[in-house]
Amino acid sequence: MIRLGSLAGYAFEGPRVLAGWTPPARPGVYAILYKPEPDTKADKYAVIYVSHADDLSTERFPFSHPRASCWIRRAGDRFKLYVCFLEVPGGLRSHRELITHELIAVYHPGCNSDQYDPAWKDQWIGEYTAPTAGPLTTDRDPSTGP
């Protein structure tokens, strides 16, 4: 098991060597990984691609996938690639898409053509202030106790 996402919120199965993996015939989110420093940091992985599928067995794994050449180029060898996957219990396609977008925003995987920015911009809904979001209006000093 490997945890991915903001605050490592998703428990993915794997990582497993991609060359020997038989994907399940189920929907899921998957990430392609490699070890950037296998000799010194064998337990550290880098995320190079994230996607989702309605049926993981139809994604043309391991090396007929449309982005496989990018994966191999990044890892240096097809046998240095790893895969991990997440089945979203009760999750719809829209849930898998949201998880995929979040992971792409967090890791910025180089083999994904689409990238997402998790930043918030005031112009999206307008700037606002609320009295509950401001500083406390009491003259009591919290460091002195009750």
Explain the meaning of each model-derived region.
Residues 1-146:
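Boundary/linker segments flanking structured domains
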